[in-house]
């Protein structure tokens, strides 16, 4: 079915990554497995082997396929890689396909929905926890993590084969462009006034107490702006 897609190459990819022990930080890629479906060529890269550009094509004539692509594209950004030109996110397309019908829309849910062999949920969690632990990993653990990543790629290949006939490709590619934008938002974070935020954290208890007192008194008053060195 993938051969019917109007692209010279179709690349399915998955990253494993961790956050340096701090949730919310930028991803730190651990490994990547990718497969070009027309030729069957596969790439397996471990941390330190990534290089300055992806090892596979990402131009206009290549379809880049992922599940929840903002995560994979976040790894692209962390590595300084350019964005793929054509992106298909099967997570987004599955959500669109079952909109209003299912509340669970992860990779295992998508595979089960289409009657495909799915990964074991317990094993998936164990491997994800192993990766998020941040290492160091033994040689055996490295092999296991890469093999786990490769199984996700194989699962995506199966999922693409059954979802391809349901795709509204022009709109799907537009949604893929949005996931690239979402990865930029996640990479850059939300800009905030850090000094004022620090003051809020420092005086939060006092602020709450004064607001409660004002509420109980039925009164409101002008509040002076928070400035460094002054409590509210």
Predicted region positions:
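Active-site-proximal helix-loop-helix substrate-binding element of RNase H-like nuclease domains
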Residues: 30, 34, 38-51, 61-164
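Glycine-rich loop/turn
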Residues: 49-56, 218-221
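Conserved "right-hand" nucleotidyltransferase catalytic core of DNA-directed polymerases
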Residues: 1-16, 25-26, 31, 40, ...
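Flexible, charged surface loops at secondary-structure boundaries
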Residues: 3-7, 55-61
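Short glycine-biased active-site loop of nucleotidyltransferases that positions the nucleotide triphosphate
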Residues: 22-25, 102
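Short secondary-structure capping/turn segments at boundaries of alpha-helices and beta-strands
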Residues: 18-21, 53-54, 62
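Ser/Thr-glycine-rich phosphate-binding loops at phosphate-binding pockets of nucleotides
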Residues: 15-22, 68
């Amino acid at each position: 079915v993938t051969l019917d897609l109007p692209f010279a190459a179709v690349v399915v990819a998955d990253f494993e990554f961790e956050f340096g022990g701090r949730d919310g930080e930028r991803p730190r890629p651990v490994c990547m497995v990718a497969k070009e479906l027309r030729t069957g060529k596969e790439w397996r890269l471990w941390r330190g082997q990534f290089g300055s550009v992806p090892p596979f094509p990402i131009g206009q004539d290549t379809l880049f396929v992922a599940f929840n692509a903002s995560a994979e594209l976040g790894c692209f950004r962390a590595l300084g890689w350019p964005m793929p030109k054509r992106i298909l996110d099967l997570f987004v397309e599955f959500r669109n396909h079952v909109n209003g019908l299912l509340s669970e829309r992860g990779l295992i849910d998508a595979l089960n929905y289409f009657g495909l062999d799915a990964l074991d949920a317990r094993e998936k969690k164990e491997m994800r926890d192993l990766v998020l632990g941040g290492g160091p990993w033994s040689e055996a653990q490295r092999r296991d993590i890469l093999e786990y990543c490769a199984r996700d790629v194989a699962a995506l290949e199966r999922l693409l084969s059954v979802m391809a006939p349901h795709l509204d490709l022009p709109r799907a590619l537009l949604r893929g462009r949005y996931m690239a934008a979402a990865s930029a938002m996640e990479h850059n974070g939300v800009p905030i006034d850090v000094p004022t935020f620090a003051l809020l954290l420092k005086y939060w208890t006092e602020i709450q107490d004064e607001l409660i007192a004002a509420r109980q008194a039925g009164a409101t008053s002008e509040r002076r702006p928070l400035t460094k060195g002054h409590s509210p």
